[in-house]
Structures are given as C-alpha cells and as structure tokens.
Amino acid sequence: MKTFLAKKETVQPKWYLIDAAGVPLGRLAVKAANIIRGRHKATYTPTVDTGDYVIVINAAKVALTGKKEEQNEYMFFSGFVGGESRRKVSLMRERHPEFIIEHAVKGMLPKNRIAAKMLTKLRVFGGETHTHEANNPVKVTV
C-alpha cells in the first residue's frame, strides 16, 4: 500500500468554533493549532496545508493559571535604539484580548513558510459574537 499524500486542490476545509471562557490558554492553543495544521485528520500531510478554520470566541475570558497574569510579559521591539517595550498580560487582556490567543497559537505552529498561511485560518474575537455564522462552524469542546 502506498503512502497517501494530500494535494492542495483536494483539501476541503471546515470551520470550527471554540469557546475560550474559563479554558486554560495552553490547552486552547494546542487544540486550535492542531486543527489549523490538520493534525486531527487522517489525511494529514506535513508539507501541505490540510488544516481547517478555527473561530475562537470569548478571548477576554481565557484562563491563566498561577501568577501568569501579573508575571508574564510580551516584549515588543521597534527596531530603534531604546525601542524595547514590555506589556503585562493583564494590560494586553484589557486592550487586545485577541493577541494573547494569537500569540500562543503562533508559537505552537511550525516555523516555516506554511505557518504564515496557517495563521490566517485563525479568527479570534474578544466577545461572544463572531462574523462567521454563514460558515456553520462546528462547536469543539476543549
């Protein structure tokens, strides 16, 4: 029996919905990254983007264990001398709750050219509503 390799033309992506309210960030990010990569399918091929779309709602209510809310920081660098800035998770949760999940999922994707394309399949919303009702997403429990 020959090994099956998926083709880009034959992939039929689906849409999945994940509710982040009260779910630990790491568990949520692993689940989302595996769906985006296509690891949950029998037709998974590492060199082809076989993944599905993921919609994450309630990003502002994602759970962080321990003291990560006060201790963890996100570092940004402008490229200029003295252009480094750091922001705590609590501040990012107030201003951009989507960034926390996007950053975690991005870290769990492979570091190659396909990862940038895979990351476009992640849609994160801070509240309970989203704009992709027409795609009939399947609800996934984490």
Curated annotation (Swiss-Prot):
<dbReference type="InterPro" id="IPR005822">
    <property type="entry name" value="Ribosomal_uL13"/>
</dbReference>
<keyword id="KW-0689">Ribosomal protein</keyword>
<keyword id="KW-0687">Ribonucleoprotein</keyword>
<dbReference type="GO" id="GO:0006412">
    <property type="term" value="P:translation"/>
</dbReference>
<dbReference type="GO" id="GO:0003729">
    <property type="term" value="F:mRNA binding"/>
</dbReference>
<dbReference type="Pfam" id="PF00572">
    <property type="entry name" value="Ribosomal_L13"/>
</dbReference>
<dbReference type="GO" id="GO:0017148">
    <property type="term" value="P:negative regulation of translation"/>
</dbReference>
<dbReference type="GO" id="GO:0003735">
    <property type="term" value="F:structural constituent of ribosome"/>
</dbReference>
<dbReference type="GO" id="GO:0022625">
    <property type="term" value="C:cytosolic large ribosomal subunit"/>
</dbReference>
<comment type="function">
    <text>This protein is one of the early assembly proteins of the 50S ribosomal subunit, although it is not seen to bind rRNA by itself. It is important during the early stages of 50S assembly.</text>
</comment>
<comment type="similarity">
    <text>Belongs to the universal ribosomal protein uL13 family.</text>
</comment>
<dbReference type="InterPro" id="IPR005823">
    <property type="entry name" value="Ribosomal_uL13_bac-type"/>
</dbReference>
<comment type="subunit">
    <text>Part of the 50S ribosomal subunit.</text>
</comment>
<dbReference type="InterPro" id="IPR036899">
    <property type="entry name" value="Ribosomal_uL13_sf"/>
</dbReference>
<protein>
    <recommendedName>
        <fullName>Large ribosomal subunit protein uL13</fullName>
    </recommendedName>
</protein>
